[in-house]
A protein has these predicted regions:
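Short clusters of hydrophobic/aromatic residues that line enzyme substrate/ligand-binding pockets
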Residues: 110, 130, 214, 395-397, ...
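Short, flexible loop/turn elements at secondary-structure junctions
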Residues: 55, 81-84, 107, 174, ...
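Class I S-adenosyl-L-methionine
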Residues: 112-118, 130-368
Length: 455
């Protein structure tokens, strides 16, 4: 991989940077040759891998897959945001990839027969009820407003029958392994039980992108599944020590090298009765049985905690910044507002009252870095990153001239390893929201590189 950072060039009023070249040998021209910005559905060749992308957002999975290989061809995609009339993500997706084969409607209303058969189904199914910005106690898990979309994945796979895809690549928040608070690990157990009943072997790993040299500290649960009839499944079945698959032989360890954390392993069975799992899995226990890495086959779970093992180069927040001269004035913090930002970022202890019970309690929080460090990966981008109002969670940097400012949309895109101005056309506030919902495309690219070689 080529991590050399290219110099920025000026073209008219735009600042152009080639973030793709930081993570691979691909250039903008080469990306266009691979069809990343084509406006027609790609022609399918003999060795191509037909992809269906659900909950596509602005196309993070597609970008990662197509950077990994030109043979990943997305033939159908779906993106629908029920909470807004203006479908920003879908509009951006179509602008880059074309409207043909794209569905902008509630996936629950799309008949399975209208979704073409594919080799790989991918998607980051949204469970924002228990995202990083929400406390686990308030989480609805799969029962939550958006979490029920998991059942649309299950419905599509089940109704496809013998024509269901051989491979799955899925993404969710890291807390999925521990939710809900009242029944730790139940939601993830439901997912594994569902996929086991359909004949899939499932690998998972909680990955922090910054641990592998990427410029954002973003922890997410990634899953790769392969059907029992595949070559990968046959290789897994032959392995006597299944924990070797987690540490060395599987897709995840070959995409992201790791080592055992403490040598403590766990193995147990999950029922293929989804209702039984929903009602009784891990009931009454305080901790989830799932560790940050694992594999499940035939209802048998093997899991352990791993640590990243990486000695390559690291990108930092400072590496992805645009020149101060091209930052719009509204992104700079005025002297009169600076004190408000310092307060938000500082430590505090406050008395609060529960609106439901009237119970008074002390709420405290520690200080955060102010400004954000430029010599390390950024903090996690959240959906509330945009807007001028002071916030504890938004990024603030100090420029070379000594001024303080927020991050501009291009910088947020770079932190997720998207092409510059990928979300151009939406408001700055909305662009920040979209990047707060997106994944780090470099994670998908690395997984896809290994998956392609072992299919």
């Amino acid at each position: 991989m080529n991590y050399k950072i290219k110099d920025m060039e000026m073209e008219g009023n735009w600042v152009l940077c080639d973030p793709i070249a930081r993570y691979s040998n691909t250039t903008h021209q080469r990306v266009r040759e691979l069809g990343l910005f084509d406006n027609i559905r790609p022609e399918i060749e003999v060795n191509d891998i037909k992809v269906v992308e659900l909950f596509a957002g602005v196309g993070g999975f597609r970008i990662g897959l197509e950077r990994a290989s030109k043979h990943f061809k997305t033939i159908w995609s779906n993106q629908w945001e029920p909470s807004t009339k203006h479908q920003d993500a879908s509009i951006i997706y179509c602008r880059h990839f074309g409207a043909e084969g794209h569905s902008n409607e509630d996936i629950a209303t799309v008949p399975t027969e209208e979704i073409p058969d594919s080799d790989l189904l991918c998607g980051g199914f949204p469970c924002q009820d228990y995202s990083v910005a929400t406390t686990l106690q308030r989480s609805g898990g799969i029962e939550g407003k958006k979490g029920v979309l998991w059942w649309q994945i299950y419905r599509i796979l089940k109704e496809k029958g013998d024509k269901r895809p051989d491979y799955l690549m899925l993404e969710n928040v890291d807390r999925l392994l521990n939710s809900p608070a009242k029944q730790r690990g139940r939601d993830f157990a439901i997912i594994l039980s569902s996929l086991s009943s359909l004949g899939y072997i499932v690998e998972w790993r909680v990955i922090n992108a910054a641990d592998y040299g990427m410029p954002q500290r973003r922890r997410r649960t990634y899953m790769v599944a392969y059907h029992k009839g595949t070559q990968l499944a046959a290789q897994f079945e032959k392995l006597s020590n299944k924990f070797d698959w987690i540490l060395q032989e599987g897709i995840m360890p070959q995409a992201f090298n790791c080592q055992e954390k403490d040598g403590k392993t766990n193995s147990f069975d999950i029922s293929d009765d989804i209702a039984e799992v929903s009602d009784n899995f891990n009931k009454g226990k305080k901790e989830s049985p799932f560790k940050n890495s694992g594999v499940m086959a035939n209802g048998k779970v093997y899991t352990l905690d791993t640590l990243p093992k990486y000695d390559g180069p690291y990108l930092t927040l400072g590496d992805i910044l645009v020149d101060e001269m091209v930052v719009p004035e509204e992104f700079f913090i005025s002297e009169e507002d600076l004190q408000k930002w310092e307060y938000q970022k500082g430590s505090k202890s406050l008395k609060r009252i529960n609106k439901t019970t009237g119970f008074e309690y002390n709420y405290s929080e520690g200080a955060m870095a102010f400004p954000d460090y430029l010599d390390r990966a950024s903090r996690t981008i959240i959906t509330g990153e945009g807007g001028a109002g002071p916030s504890r969670f938004k990024h603030i940097i100090k420029t070379e001239s000594g001024r303080y400012r927020r991050l501009v949309p291009i910088e947020l895109e770079r932190l997720n390893m998207f092409p510059d101005n990928h979300t151009f056309g939406s408001s700055d506030l909305r662009r920040a929201f979209l990047m707060g919902n997106a994944l780090v495309t470099g994670i998908v690219e690395n997984i896809a590189l290994v998956l392609k070689e072992r299919m």
